[in-house]
Amino acid sequence: MDISTRSKDPGSAERTAQKRKFPSPPHSSNGHSPQDTSTSPIKKKKKPGLLNSNNKEQSELRHGPFYYMKQPLTTDPVDVVPQDGRNDFYCWVCHREGQVLCCELCPRVYHAKCLRLTSEPEGDWFCPECEKITVAECIETQSKAMTMLTIEQLSYLLKFAIQKMKQPGTDAFQKPVPLEQHPDYAEYIFHPMDLCTLEKNAKKKMYGCTEAFLADAKWILHNCIIYNGGNHKLTQIAKVVIKICEHEMNEIEVCPECYLAACQKRDNWFCEPCSNPHPLVWAKLKGFPFWPAKALRDKDGQVDARFFGQHDRAWVPINNCYLMSKEIPFSVKKTKSIFNSAMQEMEVYVENIRRKFGVFNYSPFRTPYTPNSQYQMLLDPTNPSAGTAKIDKQEKVKLNFDMTASPKILMSKPVLSGGTGRRISLSDMPRSPMSTNSSVHTGSDVEQDAEKKATSSHFSASEESMDFLDKSTASPASTKTGQAGSLSGSPKPFSPQLSAPITTKTDKTSTTGSILNLNLDRSKAEMDLKELSESVQQQSTPVPLISPKRQIRSRFQLNLDKTIESCKAQLGINEISEDVYTAVEHSDSEDSEKSDSSDSEYISDDEQKSKNEPEDTEDKEGCQMDKEPSAVKKKPKPTNPVEIKEELKSTSPASEKADPGAVKDKASPEPEKDFSEKAKPSPHPIKDKLKGKDETDSPTVHLGLDSDSESELVIDLGEDHSGREGRKNKKEPKEPSPKQDVVGKTPPSTTVGSHSPPETPVLTRSSAQTSAAGATATTSTSSTVTVTAPAPAATGSPVKKQRPLLPKETAPAVQRVVWNSSSKFQTSSQKWHMQKMQRQQQQQQQQNQQQQPQSSQGTRYQTRQAVKAVQQKEITQSPSTSTITLVTSTQSSPLVTSSGSMSTLVSSVNADLPIATASADVAADIAKYTSKMMDAIKGTMTEIYNDLSKNTTGSTIAEIRRLRIEIEKLQWLHQQELSEMKHNLELTMAEMRQSLEQERDRLIAEVKKQLELEKQQAVDETKKKQWCANCKKEAIFYCCWNTSYCDYPCQQAHWPEHMKSCTQSATAPQQEADAEVNTETLNKSSQGSSSSTQSAPSETASASKEKETSAEKSKESGSTLDLSGSRETPSSILLGSNQGSDHSRSNKSSWSSSDEKRGSTRSDHNTSTSTKSLLPKESRLDTFWD
């Protein structure tokens, strides 16, 4: 432990305090308050002056009372420069010593390898933890949850998290480490931390975000690894504590209100809707039926679902989620009580939402889940145009807890003041995520960047604020404003129908994708401006506001082309951007809107041609109808155009407001909404400004309006409407009817003069469909769709004139389609060329419309055939192009069979005569320039490919270098891990060896003790028994004091050896003396008996009694085996013992014999012998059993 190189002289603390006085903010317990690192004073939440006022108190709080007592072990200033006494000694990542980088804001240090840095950074350096906390606490980049919470509320939630971290077994981390028990703790641990300290800091409101709290909590694990080692039991517990902390912080970030409710666990806490309610879904887990749940968030194609009932949670694949409908997506045969209780709880939740927000909508059956679905469930079904129910943002949510919507989101104040449109500043409100894409850009690239920032940082806020934006910005006054700023500041872009789509886009596409949408939008809007402005210039009519937009267009053309191409290259798109944001979106609202807007262009154009009749009212009606395309879209398919016209007239201002919701009601896909919004901004204000002006420049199929035709049916099939319709007919052949309906709907609002009886217009639309195969040719096919709509007279006009759909208009239509389908690929020269052709066609159109000669029906049919031939010619002449959709977008001629005079048909036929020639010329021009455009596009693509390959090479080299650094770091970590494991294993082996030895010694001692005990017992048992002196078996017979035998053979075998020491031989003389005494007495008695024969028996009896007495004595003494026979063997002695007894018996009878003397002498001898050596076996060999 090279602590000597880490520590410094005692004055270092004061020096560093002076050094860090100003750059260092007041410390939270982890040594920093990272929000102060931001340069803007607005972002600071604590003043740096606090450091000076209570520096000692703060330090004691951070380091404990013993921090300043920590003295350096040596005064060797080896590592004074990198280590200045205010930083830790151990790397924050690997928890080891070494050459480290010190953070300027906190005590943490890092190895350069652990940070994957090739070289040490210059100047002040801030560690990743501090950067993370700074980002999390900065007002502009803080998370959605942090924008909703104040510091007090966050501190309140952190207290719950700390309580959950106090799990059983974490007692060691709940209080500071007692230095009395661990006096060396301060030598290793620079920054002590425990749960009690965390709780105190939370009470003091020292944490501005969850990241700061988590970073502080990680000190517990860091210190534990340093002091106890990475494999210690306490370290495992510390890891569990940190995992719990990470989980709790993550839950707070997901939804603070849900977290609080889950912690407080009130009655029906799961049924309380949040201020921004979570969508309800049917979610399915494997092995379970579809279950009602809240969708809190979605990530990587998975939905974080919280289920009703048991309140379980799970990540469910997004394709297994359906929006909440009244019926379960896939019915279950038998429902269990658990499911029923979950459904009841969900119904309570729905009621609470209705009580809080006033509305809740069940989605249609099996509607797939998409993000931001809460807006669909909050749509008012009775008044869909009103948008979503207003979500409370101003009120603080009172959940026994002050949870506010962030004060930064001041959405409720009106965005527009008065009737004039002004640019909405970022300071007033964070932009809706769609705002960057939807507004018509006036060239402020800086502002667009700022808006992009706003979309990312205020994602959630803008979601919540969509309804405000909708209601405040969609006012008719703002749309009608004639100032230049109204184009950019027109509030239409902020309609809520766009908020949902763009939020998904921002989540799921890269920034290049958003740039692409931005540029497509801008280019489209400028194309509209070009067409309108040129048409106005051609008619030489006063245009108040077109010229500024014209300048904007010319200023941005080159930049836009470059940007579009670069975006296309970045996204790897070989085909048209239509697929990016239009064709992919199977949308009818786009087409409807396009047709509506183009209707108004045709209307104002035709009305301008009828200058003799100042029908300004109709022109205004056209503009009004123009303002409300979505309202038109929403209405049911019309069968009476006049009614629609009146309806449009009467409801135009109101439906202006309603039209954002209109698109939503149709539940059109999000990209469709996106595009419909894009379609709105530029056409509306310009058309308002161009009221009464000519709009023949509009590159759509214009319809010849006679000056006296008031109620005639305007059949609009042009521009993008027809082009998109072609694409849509290809992708969604089932959906032509909405477009046709719109075509039938919109014209009536542009009636001009005469009264005509009701007639049935037959709309024949030949819409071209563009198909881009790879990067190659566009093939177009003509499809005719006939829509018949009964059109009663608007004002009872006797004759309704037919306006033929002029085929010569196909070229302008093509031009518009070309722009929208390949806007990324065109250069300025191509654009200007197309506009030039457009002007020529418009001039021809005006001439033909003024002529309007009569023609025959057959000629009209021939004209259509010619037009079709021209289309085929265009297709064949256009070489494989991936960028230009050479489609005569809509060749439609409405055949209106009139119940009135035939003059209408004749005039329309005559009007068609010069048209075929014009169309052929246009086709020739298009074919002529196709190759040139393709060459330019090929060159551009080659350059893009080269640039991309270069960039790829550079990035590959950088990637290789990064991977090498990564490999080195991993190798170093591997070596460190191996060395640590080796060291730990050696320690473990030593401990195991020592323990085994101790165990062996212990066992040996125990065994010895046991064996000694058993030996003693065996000895004792052995001593209790007599053993044979010859064979060592257990003895039965006793010879003398130390000699016993198991049997007679052993006695005989052992006798030669034992004879010398036998104790019985020592007692033999005494026995002989006793025998002599007995013999003498016997002799005396025998002599006395001889005198009297009567006394003999009695004497004999007395003698025998004496013998018995002596025998008993010898029996009692039992201590000797009389072996006094001089040299006789024991066997003879033993044999003689039995004979002796027989002799004694015979001697008893011998006294009765006559030969008394001889018998007495023999008996005396025998008696002495028997007493001497021939005792009975019982007397001679005593048996001793235990």
From Swiss-Prot:
UniProt binding sites for Zn(2+) 2: 103, 106, 127, 130
Residues where Zn(2+) 1 binds: 91, 94, 111, 114
Subcellular location(s) of the protein: Nucleus; Chromosome; Cytoplasm
Polar residues bias spans: 433-442, 472-489, 818-832, 873-884, 1121-1140
Bromo domain mapped to chain residues: 145-252
Interaction with histone H3K14ac: annotated segments: 75-406
Tissue expression per record: Expressed in neurons (at protein level). Absent in astrocytes (at protein level). Expressed in all tissues examined with highest expression in brain, lung, pancreas, and placenta. Expressed in cutaneous T-cell lymphomas (CTCL).
Induction: Induced by all-trans-retinoic acid (ATRA) (at protein level).
Glycyl lysine isopeptide (Lys-Gly) (interchain with G-Cter in SUMO2) crosslink location in chain: 56, 70, 390, 413, 453, 505, 530, 549, 611, 645, 657, 1115
Pfam families per UniProt: Bromodomain (PF00439), DUF3544 (PF12064), MYND_ZMYND11_ZMYD8 (PF24324), PHD (PF00628), PWWP (PF00855), ZMYND8_CC (PF23460)
Stretches the record annotates as Required for interaction with histone H3 and histone H4: 88-327
Low complexity bias locations: 766-799, 835-857, 1085-1103
Stated consequence of mutating residue 104 to A: Decreases interaction with histone H3K4me0
Positions of Zn(2+) 3 binding: 255, 258, 274, 1028, 1031, 1046, 1050
Zinc finger (MYND-type): 1028-1062
Modified residues (N6-acetyllysine): 413
Region of interest: Required for interaction with CCNT1: 1-850
Gene Ontology biological process: double-strand break repair via homologous recombination; modulation of excitatory postsynaptic potential; negative regulation of cell migration; negative regulation of transcription by RNA polymerase II; nervous system development; positive regulation of dendritic spine development; positive regulation of dendritic spine maintenance; positive regulation of filopodium assembly
Subunit structure: Monomer and homodimer. Interacts with NuRD subcomplexes containing GATAD2A. Interacts with the histone deacetylase NuRD complex subunit CHD4; the interaction is direct, appears to occur with monomeric ZMYND8, and is increased following DNA damage. Interacts (via N-terminus) with the P-TEFb complex subunit CCNT1 (via central region); the interaction is direct and the association appears to occur between homodimeric ZMYND8 and the activated form of the P-TEFb complex. Interacts (via N-terminus) with DBN1 (via ADF-H domain); the interaction leads to sequestering of ZMYND8 in the cytoplasm.
UniProt cross-references to PANTHER family, sorted A to Z: MYND-TYPE ZINC FINGER-CONTAINING CHROMATIN READER ZMYND8 (PTHR46453:SF3), PROTEIN KINASE C-BINDING PROTEIN 1 (PTHR46453)
Protein name per Swiss-Prot or TrEMBL: MYND-type zinc finger-containing chromatin reader ZMYND8
Provenance organism: Homo sapiens
Gene that this polypeptide is encoded by: ZMYND8
